[in-house]
């Protein structure tokens, strides 16, 4: 596995669980608001690459005190070794939460069929017709829709996540986006953090919008 980060203890990334977090290198999207820009290239920096053996050693030592492991990115489903890695986690008795953009339903289907994931969080970037604009690449929207259906019908715990980027999406866009999430599925909204954006223009627009907000008198 091409790993680029490891957090041995997190209280906020796996709902209801004390978990470790593993970050994979590489993403096929170029969302301008991404706060993990260093994880976008498929090729990792040898100086910062995380050794899988070291990660497994730490998890083996702590597995009885952890409720699970979050595998995030980047985009984990780009990793050819992902099924093998998840099997290693499962042999430790650890539940697995997968964070994904949903672009590879074939991989997701295999992971679900082999019961290698216990929780799936899929990003919902935009209304379907705006996906290419918001992700910065040509998108196979049908693939994301297939992943959504797989997740909802799988029976595993799941959530859909949206980052509110007001300079890029309108209130009408958010309403249409919310309608894409099947009834009964959890849909969480995350705040855009402009300081970490990959797009200088987006950072500037967010700063300008913040400056124009009314402030209480001192």
Where are these predicted regions, by residue range?
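Conserved strand-to-loop "acid loop" that flanks and positions the catalytic carboxylate
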Residues: 74
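Conserved AdoMet/S-adenosylmethionine-binding subsite of the radical SAM
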Residues: 56-68, 77-204
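Hydrophobic packing within well-folded, soluble alpha/beta domains
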Residues: 27, 31-34, 89, 98
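N-terminal [4Fe-4S]-dependent radical SAM core
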Residues: 1-23, 32-44, 61-65
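A structural motif corresponding to the C-terminal lobe/cap of the Radical SAM core domain
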Residues: 205-209
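Non-heme iron-sulfur electron-transfer modules
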Residues: 41-56
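Terminal, non-globular segments
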Residues: 214-218
